[in-house]
């Protein structure tokens, strides 16, 4: 909502996040820092990513909200896919007209795009030295996008990697 900047500055007085950027923040909970990633999608929408317990995080974030600001848990409404590797930009370029040049869409950037005609939240979020895109799509489109990526990815020798592969 319109008070999204107020939430960000309440969480961290020094935090500034422009549209399309992803920043790391620590929220204190009983003097324990909770790491979140704040992804500013538009002037009035942000995506918060964390590996912390969802219900506890929502409860904690609600402490920062004014009555007219809404926090919506979209965890179960989206499928997350990750494309890791040196050819991922080439593969994604087959599915969108958006320029994904690394100089224009750097790591720790986000935007909404159409991939294979599907509204997608695209995060460029490198893992150490590995190029990594995280794709968030409505759950009902997850399997379709997965199959499209695997099919088009054959020329790039794409391989499925389970969650354990992140470690």
Predicted regions and their residues:
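Basic, glycine/lysine-rich polyanion-binding surfaces/domains
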Residues: 1-167
């Amino acid at each position: 909502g319109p008070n999204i900047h107020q939430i960000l500055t309440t969480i961290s007085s020094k935090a500034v996040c422009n549209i399309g950027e992803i920043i790391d923040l620590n929220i204190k909970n009983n003097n324990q820092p909770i790491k979140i990633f704040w992804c500013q999608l538009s002037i009035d929408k942000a995506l918060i990513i964390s590996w912390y317990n969802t219900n506890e995080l929502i409860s904690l974030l609600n402490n920062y909200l004014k009555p007219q600001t809404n926090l919506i848990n979209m965890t179960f409404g989206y499928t997350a896919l990750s494309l890791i590797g040196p050819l991922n930009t080439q593969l994604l370029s087959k599915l969108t007209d958006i320029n994904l040049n690394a100089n224009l869409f750097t790591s720790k950037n986000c935007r909404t795009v159409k991939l294979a005609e599907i509204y997608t939240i695209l995060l460029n979020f490198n893992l150490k030295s590995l190029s990594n895109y995280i794709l968030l799509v409505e759950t009902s489109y997850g399997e379709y996008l997965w199959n499209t990526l695997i099919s088009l990815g054959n020329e790039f020798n794409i391989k499925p990697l389970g969650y354990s592969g992140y470690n």
